[in-house]
């Protein structure tokens, strides 16, 4: 069993925060038949982590951070996802290699237009959201090996040839992990958004 782990990092930076959604992305799965006589007996796994591409919202007069506790003028929204990202088969239809894509999508960071860009409070709120980013990335990194092992355990038991029903079984495993990642992420980020943390943020910028 081989697991290869790659990171897809956005050049513009990636943000994540307390307003979350879970999604198991269903897409057309590319399946390639490869005649590789030197393959190992067990399938290989390739995992890519996607940190997402953020959209910044600051000019929106209708500040909407519903669901974010003690946001203090800023919040983020993000969708967690996990999906099959390609399958290579042997000539007899057994899985030789399977790819997974695990990450964040539809990432938005919103800061109230009442906070002037470059002001002390604007910078403090932005710094707070960047800390949320670090927590989200740790969730992805933490769960990726466990997800890979769980999917491989399922794949190794699948009889050839691979069928759509079997692919759906893998999707179900991925969806369960998306829910788990979301729950753990919520717990970790809620610790950052306590009343004490909110008061500390406000105290950094006395009028």
Positions of PLM-derived features:
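Bacterial N-terminal signal peptides that target proteins for export
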Residues: 1-7
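Extended, surface-exposed interaction regions
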Residues: 104-106, 117, 122, 126-127
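Bacterial N-terminal signal peptides
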Residues: 7-15
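Metalloprotease/metallohydrolase-associated module, dominated by Zn2+-dependent proteases
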Residues: 29-113, 154-207
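Sec/Tat signal peptide C-region and signal peptidase I cleavage site
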Residues: 17-21
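Active-site recognition of the HExxH zinc-binding catalytic motif
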Residues: 124-136
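Membrane-interfacial alpha-helical segments at the cytosolic side of multi-pass membrane proteins
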Residues: 137-148
């Amino acid at each position: 069993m081989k697991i290869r782990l790659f990171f897809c990092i956005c050049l513009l930076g990636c943000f994540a925060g307390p307003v979350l959604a879970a999604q198991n992305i269903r897409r057309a799965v590319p399946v390639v038949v490869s005649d590789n006589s030197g393959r190992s007996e067990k399938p290989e796994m390739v995992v890519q982590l996607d940190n997402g591409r953020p959209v910044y919202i600051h000019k929106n007069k209708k500040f909407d951070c519903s669901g974010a506790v003690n946001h203090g003028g800023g919040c983020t929204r993000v969708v967690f996802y996990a999906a099959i990202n390609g399958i290579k088969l042997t000539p007899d239809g057994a899985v030789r290699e399977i790819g997974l894509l695990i990450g964040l999508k539809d990432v938005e960071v919103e800061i109230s237009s009442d906070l002037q860009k470059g002001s002390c409070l604007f910078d403090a709120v932005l710094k707070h959201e960047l800390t949320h980013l670090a927590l989200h990335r740790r969730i992805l990194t933490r769960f990726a090996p466990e997800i890979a092992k769980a999917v491989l355990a399922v794949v190794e038991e699948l009889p050839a040839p691979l069928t759509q029903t079997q692919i759906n079984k893998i999707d179900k495993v991925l969806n369960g992990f998306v829910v788990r990642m979301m729950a753990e992420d919520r717990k970790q980020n809620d610790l950052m958004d306590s009343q004490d943390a909110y008061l500390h943020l406000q105290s950094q910028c006395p009028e």
